[in-house]
């Protein structure tokens, strides 16, 4: 019984830590996207495809599907493709619902803007993630100590 409780505690602590790490990984992914747009002067659909090979494996299917959908369904808006694909590929992957919502909502505004506004939209999304990560850090540390 004691070992089960200890095992459960370590499992919960690892899950808490993973939630925080996912926020940092999403932030890293957005920095890559911003860099492709800013310094590579890459159009958004191509930039999404390029960063899909540079991000963590759990986000690669999402990015690759967005890029493929943009290529094959040019009549659909970027926002619609981004949000539908997020529902299909990210909802079950991202543990923290707020990270998922922030990333999903970015698709509403980024697709139809010029390069400068795309960069600012990505930066705003990164700031929202930073705020959420900051709020989570103390809670994760406390919870991890309690679970262990």
Q: What is each of the regions a protein language model found here?
A:
Residues 21, 94-98, 121:
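A generic short alpha-helical patch detector that favors 3-5-residue windows
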Residues 2-71:
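Juxtamembrane/interface alpha-helical elements of multi-pass membrane proteins
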């Amino acid at each position: 019984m004691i070992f089960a409780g200890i095992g459960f505690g370590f499992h919960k602590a690892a899950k808490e830590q993973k939630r925080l790490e996912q926020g940092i990984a999403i932030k890293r992914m957005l920095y890559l996207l911003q860099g492709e747009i800013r310094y590579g002067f890459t159009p958004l659909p191509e930039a999404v495809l390029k960063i899909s090979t540079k991000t963590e494996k759990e986000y690669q299917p999402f990015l690759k599907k967005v890029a493929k959908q943009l290529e094959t369904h040019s009549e659909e808006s970027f926002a619609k493709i981004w949000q539908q694909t997020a529902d299909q590929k990210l909802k079950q992957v991202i543990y923290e619902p707020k990270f998922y919502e922030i990333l999903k909502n970015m698709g509403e505004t980024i697709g139809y803007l010029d390069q400068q506004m795309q960069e600012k939209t990505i930066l705003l999304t990164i700031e929202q993630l930073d705020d959420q990560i900051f709020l989570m850090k103390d809670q994760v540390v406390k919870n991890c100590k309690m679970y262990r």
